[in-house]
């Protein structure tokens, strides 16, 4: 009998690519199924993700997957909490503009989350230091 060698990394990459191409992660507004919204904490963009991030996100990811399997149209966005003095201080320490420092960290964290197989709706990603995002926060506070 021939021995079969499994390559988990290749299998994972294959299916993640297919699921993303099929739009499995994305909820459509015109979908007639019952809608379910789920949000996890937004990681702070101070550097690499660590086990504490995934410890907090894994239950949300599992619940969103479960609801998809139950037939719900699940909105499960991700975002990055990107404002704060620690990010600015780290950027200054590394001689990098704070916005570049933050966006580089966002890119790295996005890649890490995708590698872990998180099933977020990447089309609904929010970065809190993006003017297109925080203009709505400012608008809301002005309305209070």
Question: For each of these PLM feature ranges, what is it?
Answer:
Residues 1-144:
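N-terminal, positively charged nucleic-acid-binding surface of large information/translation enzymes
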